């Protein structure tokens, strides 16, 4: 008689975590950083159709790395969550913190109760009235949440990108300076690499706008900003 196969719970969790980390590391990186007038999102993403950066609600945006169909499912769920809560209560009641908590519950449940975890990492950000009131939350595949300030890097060779961001980031940067710092940090993954504007997906939450703060930056505008002070 054969003995039933048993895997300790600790080993199951470790295997799932390793699986998710490997999937996320295979993707291209995204960086999120604060600048003087809001929050900047920069993705190494040449695709014009498959977005890694998206608007969720008036002051809230979403960035993700990993498996596209999985984080797109989460993005759509986030939009529905925001729309329903804004309609039933008040638009001011829709916050990045509330959305991050909802995502954390979903990701945590998937990680613990299903055989395959989501291969995703997310940032949910909300532009406040000033830099001190900005909210940036980083969510990992197991539902863990971290409240970040200044900058975040996800996906790809994340250690190299984070180190480059640490060296370049300063509080109160202009948009052009923040964009250069973000792009140079993405380029740090590979010696001699240079990212052109058409290979980048860039968006901002601009606190100087009214109502909807999210806007995408087209390639000509990206080139113009990168040239400033270069």
From Swiss-Prot:
Role, per record: Component of the proteasome core, a large protease complex with broad specificity involved in protein degradation.
Organism of this sequence: Thermomonospora curvata (strain ATCC 19995 / DSM 43183 / JCM 3096 / KCTC 9072 / NBRC 15933 / NCIMB 10081 / Henssen B9)
GO biological process: modification-dependent protein catabolic process; proteasomal protein catabolic process
The protein's name in its UniProt record: Proteasome subunit alpha
Gene Ontology MF term list: threonine-type endopeptidase activity
Main subcellular location: cytoplasm
Subunit structure: The 20S proteasome core is composed of 14 alpha and 14 beta subunits that assemble into four stacked heptameric rings, resulting in a barrel-shaped structure. The two inner rings, each composed of seven catalytic beta subunits, are sandwiched by two outer rings, each composed of seven alpha subunits. The catalytic chamber with the active sites is on the inside of the barrel. Has a gated structure, the ends of the cylinder being occluded by the N-termini of the alpha-subunits. Is capped by the proteasome-associated ATPase, ARC.
HAMAP family for this protein: Proteasome_A_B
Record keywords, A-Z: Cytoplasm, Proteasome
Similarity comment text for this entry: Belongs to the peptidase T1A family.
Transmembrane segments: none
GO CC term, one of those recorded: cytoplasm
Pathway assignment: Protein degradation; proteasomal Pup-dependent pathway
